Amino acid sequence: MAIRVYKPTTPGRRNASVSDFSDLTRSTPEKSLIRKNSKTGGRNNYGRMTSRHRGGGHKRQYRLIDFRRWDKDGVPATVAQIEYDPNRSARIALLHYADGEKRYIIAPEGIKQGDRIETGANADIKPGNNLPLRNIPTGTVVHAIELRPLGGAKIARSAGAAVQLVAKDGAYAQLRMPSGEIRNVDARCRATVGEVGNSDHANIQLGKAGRARWMGKRPITRGESMNPVDHPHGGRTRGGKPPVSPWGKGEVRTRRPKKASNKMIVRRRPNGKNRK
């Protein structure tokens, strides 16, 4: 994928860039693999806001992505199309399996139309193939990794994401996450070889507020710039109080300090001046 940079013909075009979509081979999705995707505007079933800065945006159809490929062990597939997915930053690949079934997967870097894809413990180590971590050589870059066996891919699914298998220790495999954290994962968990494609997605500049609104993102306003009636930080007399949400809740870390999965973390991600 390449980035197309606009000339500054208008203020909205200045510094704006888009994908040229040259890596796509099809413009319409497979009808049997799309579902309705309703918007919530950041509200729950009571109509109360639970996630700020969300609302509006273009309508989307949800593409059913196969994150559990273990039921296709030993069934080869061919990459039929590389498609755009409005619901994620990565591209998706349409697979035609030898048994006649069609499925979408996250498109790895370097995959192209006509490639052969395999699933199972005996699959070759090549981009797009899915197999257990215990069958993957140390040092291999992988993505779409399960956290629990047969639980479906949870880690490294966005554009350009890559995780390195750094070691194997008994029943566990050690993975270096994109954040720099090293974590133990059950060696029976599945992973897909290669990194996620569309890595240039991070270099796209929206250029104007309107493009963010097309994506369903609403403006972010600081509490200090509001009036006291609208936010606890509003007005000129905040008085050094700790930061809170518009509803007065303290802005604290949301991860439980005694979370059971903490024992799976071998080395924490670097932070502050130690981050590379």
From Swiss-Prot:
| NCBIfam families noted in UniProt | rplB_bact
UniProt cross-references to Gene3D superfamilies, sorted A to Z: 2.30.30.30, Nucleic acid-binding proteins (2.40.50.140), Ribosomal protein L2, domain 3 (4.10.950.10)
Source domain of life = Bacteria
**GO CC terms:** large ribosomal subunit
Q: State how it assembles.
A: Part of the 50S ribosomal subunit. Forms a bridge to the 30S subunit in the 70S ribosome.
Query: Which residue intervals are annotated with compositional bias (Basic residues) in the record?
Result: 255-276
Provide the transmembrane region boundaries: none
What is the purpose of this protein?
One of the primary rRNA binding proteins. Required for association of the 30S and 50S subunits to form the 70S ribosome, for tRNA binding and peptide bond formation. It has been suggested to have peptidyltransferase activity; this is somewhat controversial. Makes several contacts with the 16S rRNA in the 70S ribosome.
Name this polypeptide is given: Large ribosomal subunit protein uL2
Which positions form S-S bridges? none
